[in-house]
Amino acid sequence: MGYYSLTEITAVQYAKDHGYFEAKANVVCHEIGDGNLNYVFKLDDGEKSIIIKQALPYAKVVGESWPLSIKRATIESKALQIFAQYVPDYVPAVYSHDEELAITVIEDLSRLTITRKGLIGGEEYPLLSQHIGRFLAHVLFYTSDFGLQSEEKRVLEGTFVNPDLCKITEDLVFTDPFGHYDTNDYEPDLQLVVDELWSDKTLKLKVAQYKYKFLTRKETLIHGDLHTGSIFSSPSETKVIDPEFATYGPFGFDIGQFIANLLLNALSREEEKRSVLFFHIEKTWSYFVETFTKLWIGEGVEVYTKEKQWLPIILQNIFTDAVGFAGCELIRRTIGLAHVADLDEIENKETRIQAKKQALSLGKELIKYESKSADIQLFRTLFQQTVSGGVKA
C-alpha cells in the first residue's frame, strides 16, 4: 500500500489491525502533537492507552515545501531502544516500529508533564537533574569509544547517519541565527541588538568553530535535540523522548542544549524564583561527572582509559563544548525559526523583549567564553553578570 498519513480514524484502525485493541473496542483517539515534524496520536479504550507517532515527509512547521525523509522515524525508534539498553527507566517503552509507514507505537506518558510546560508553571521536579545527568553519562559513555569496542562503534555510527535532521541543526542552530536568513523570526524591537550580533566577527568565528565540531566530531550517540520540550517529568520520574535528531556527534552537545533551555526558563522568572534552575544546571553536571567517572573506571574498554590524567582532559573538553553549544542554543531559540514558550509566553511586551535581549547577550558571552576549568558555577556567574534583575510579577 505504501506510505500514507494517518488520521484519528485510521490510527485507530491501524492499532486494532496490529493487535493493540480488540476489533470491537471503543477506542478514543486524539491528535496531541505540538511539535514541528510529526503526528502524535493518543489512543485509549478506557483500560489501556498507547501513543502512535508518525513522521511526516515534510516539516509540519513549514509545509510540503520543506521535504524530509521519513527514515528519521526509524532512527528515533532505534535510538530509544539503544537508550533503553543503558537507562531503561529514563525512556518510554517502544512497542513496535513500522518502517514503511514511519510509525512507532510507544508507551503513553500522560501521567507525566512535558518538562518545559511544568517549569513554566512553577514546578521544580527535584529529581530532574539527577536523572538527566545519569541519562547523559550512560548513553554518551556506552556509545563512545570509551565504552564500546571501536569496530562496534563504527557499525553503530553507520546506523545513525541522519542527513536531513543534521542539516536542520546545522542551519537553524549554527548558521541562520547569525546572519540574514529567511528562517529567522524575531520582533522588530530586537533589530538593533540583532544587527549588533550579526556584525560581531569574533562571535561568528567562535560559532564557526562550534559548527565545525558538530559537523566533524563523531564522538558518541547524541539525542540531538535535548531540550525541556523533549522530556516528560513528574516529581519522581523523568522520561526522555523524541530522539529523531539522533546522530553521532560531540559529547557536549546534548549537555549544552539541556542547560541552555534551563537558562531560558530562568530568564522568564522573577529573580527570587531562579535558584531551582541553577540547582538543576549544576546538579546535572555533577551527576554526569560522577556517573561518567565511575563508568570510565569500571567499564572502560579503550586501553588509555587507564591513564589517570586523561579523564580530566576529556571532561574539560566536554564542558568547554557544552558552554559554547549552550550559547548557540540560547540565540537560536530567541531569534531563529523555533522559539520556546518560556520567552514567547511572557505576557508583558516590554518584559518579554528585555528577556530576549538578555538571552542574546548571555548566548554571546557563553559562545565567546574561554573556559580554563570545568567549573559549572560559570553558568550562574555569567548569568548574574549579564542579566540584571528578573521578570516582574
UniProtKB/Swiss-Prot annotation:
Q: How does it assemble?
A: Homodimer.
Superkingdom per UniProt = Bacteria
* Keyword Transmembrane among record annotations: no
Q: Which InterPro entries match?
A: Aminoglycoside_PTrfase, Kinase-like_dom_sf, Methylthioribose_kinase
Task: Please report the name of this protein according to its UniProt entry.
Answer: Methylthioribose kinase
So where does ATP get bound? N38, K53, E107, D108, L109, D242, P243, E244
- Please give one Gene Ontology molecular function term for this protein: ATP binding
What's an example GO BP annotation here? Answer: L-methionine salvage from methylthioadenosine
Q: What is its EC number?
A: 2.7.1.100
Sequence similarity: Belongs to the methylthioribose kinase family.
Q: Which UniProt keywords apply?
A: Amino-acid biosynthesis, ATP-binding, Kinase, Methionine biosynthesis, Nucleotide-binding, Transferase
Q: Which Pfam families match?
A: APH
Residues annotated for substrate binding in this entry: D225, R332
Pathway of action:
Amino-acid biosynthesis; L-methionine biosynthesis via salvage pathway; S-methyl-5-thio-alpha-D-ribose 1-phosphate from S-methyl-5'-thioadenosine (hydrolase route): step 2/2
Listed under catalytic activity are: 5-(methylsulfanyl)-D-ribose + ATP = 5-(methylsulfanyl)-alpha-D-ribose 1-phosphate + ADP + H(+)
* Functional summary from the UniProt entry: Catalyzes the phosphorylation of methylthioribose into methylthioribose-1-phosphate.
